[in-house]
C-alpha cells in the first residue's frame, strides 16, 4: 500500500519494536501519524517529500506494526515524553542526529514534545490539526467538544475502553473518519481496510495507554513547561483544517509556545494528509526546503 520505493524495516528501541518505512534521499524527515491510523496516512505526500528528503515514517509504539509493552495505569510508557525519547534514539540509530519532524494528531503531540525536550535535535517542526495537550483540555467544553470523545472515553481505567474499542473496531474507525473529516470518501476503502486490520486487541491496549498518558502525564508536562516559560525554538509550521472551528485560535496558541510560527489553514477537516494532500504538500515542501 505504501509506495514501493520505500523499504520496510524493523528497529528495536528499548522494549518497542518499531515498524519503519524509509525512502528517498536528502535531509532526514520524520513523519508521525495519529489515531486511529498508521504510517499509511502519509502515502499521498511521502513520495514527493522523498524527492528531497530521507523520509522515515514509523508506526507509533503499539500502533500498527510496532509492538510495545503494556502501559501503566496512568499511561506510563506512553507519555509523549517517553515516545519522543524513543524516536530520537531511533533516528540516532539510523544515523540522524538532527532532523525535521512532521506530526499529525497524536503524532504531532509526540513531535512538539520532541522539540521541547530535544531542541538540539529538531531542525524544523510541523504540527497538523492540533494545539498543545494542556491547551486542548482547557478548551474542551460545549458542542464542538463532542468530537473529542477519545480524550475521556479511552482514558478510562482498563479494561473498559479496551473492550469497547475491540468490540466493534470498524464502527469506531468509520465514526472517526466520517465525522472528523469534511470528505469521508477521502479516506479510501483500501486505507480503511488497512487501518481496521491494524486495530488488534494489542493495538487497542496501546491506544488507550496513549490517551491515559495524555490525561494523566502529558498535560502535566505541558503545564510545567508553560509555567517555566519553556518554548519551542525550532521554526514551527502549524496547519489546521478550515472546518475545525474548535481550532480557530490555534495560531495565537502556538505563538505562545514557539518562537517562530507560520500558521496556515487549508480546506478540510481533521485528516489533512489524506483529505487535502494537494494543499498540505506545497506547505510542507516550502517549509522544509530542499
Task: Write out the residue ranges for each language-model feature.
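Flexible "cap/lid" subdomain of the alpha/beta-hydrolase fold that forms the substrate-access gate
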Residues: 1-9, 13, 17-20, 28, ...
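Catalytic histidine-centered segment of alpha/beta-hydrolase-like enzymes
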Residues: 269-277, 281
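Short, conserved structural micro-motifs that define repeat-unit consensus positions
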Residues: 33-39, 61-63
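Serine-hydrolase catalytic-loop signature spanning alpha/beta hydrolases and amidase-signature enzymes
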Residues: 36-44, 55
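Short beta-strand element of the alpha/beta-hydrolase
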Residues: 27-33
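A short, Lys/Arg-enriched amphipathic alpha-helix followed by its capping loop at the start of a domain
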Residues: 44-53, 93
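A short acidic, amphipathic alpha-helical/loop segment
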Residues: 44-45, 250-253, 279
Amino acid at each position: 500500500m505504501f509506495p514501493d520505493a520505500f523499504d520496510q524495516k524493523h528497529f528495536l528501541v528499548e522494549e518497542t519494536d518499531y515498524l519503519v518505512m524509509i525512502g528517498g534521499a536528502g535531509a532526514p524527515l520524520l513523519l508521525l501519524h495519529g489515531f486511529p491510523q498508521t504510517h499509511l496516512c502519509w502515502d499521498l505526500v511521502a513520495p514527493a517529500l522523498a524527492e528531497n528528503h530521507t523520509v522515515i515514517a514509523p508506526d507509533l509504539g503499539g500502533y500498527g506494526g510496532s509492538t510495545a509493552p503494556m502501559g501503566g495505569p496512568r499511561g506510563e510508557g506512553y507519555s509523549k515524553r517517553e515516545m519522543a525519547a524513543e524516536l530520537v534514539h531511533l533516528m540516532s540509530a539510523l544515523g540522524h542526529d538532527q532532523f525535521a519532524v512532521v506530526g499529525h494528531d497524536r503524532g504531532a503531540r509526540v513531535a512538539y514534545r520532541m522539540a521541547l525536550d530535544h531542541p538540539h535535535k529538531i531542525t524544523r517542526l510541523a504540527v497538523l490539526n492540533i494545539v498543545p495537550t494542556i491547551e486542548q483540555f482547557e478548551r474542551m467544553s460545549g458542542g464542538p467538544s463532542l468530537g473529542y470523545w477519545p480524550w475521556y472515553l479511552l482514558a478510562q481505567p482498563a479494561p473498559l475502553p479496551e473492550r469497547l474499542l475491540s468490540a466493534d473496531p470498524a464502527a469506531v474507525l468509520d465514526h472517526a473518519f466520517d465525522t472528523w473529516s469534511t470528505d469521508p470518501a477521502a479516506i479510501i476503502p483500501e486505507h480503511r481496510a488497512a487501518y481496521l486490520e491494524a486495530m488488534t486487541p494489542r493495538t487497542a491496549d496501546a491506544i488507550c495507554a496513549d490517551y491515559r498518558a495524555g490525561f494523566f502525564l502529558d498535560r502535566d508536562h505541558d503545564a510545567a513547561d508553560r509555567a517555566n516559560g519553556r518554548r519551542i525554538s525550532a521554526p514551527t509550521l502549524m496547519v489546521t483544517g478550515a472546518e475545525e472551528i474548535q481550532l480557530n485560535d490555534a495560531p495565537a496558541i502556538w505563538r505562545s509556545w514557539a518562537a517562530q510560527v507560520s500558521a496556515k489553514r487549508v480546506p478540510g477537516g481533521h485528516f489533512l494528509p489524506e483529505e487535502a494532500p494537494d494543499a498540505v504538500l506545497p506547505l510542507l515542501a516550502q517549509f522544509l526546503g530542499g
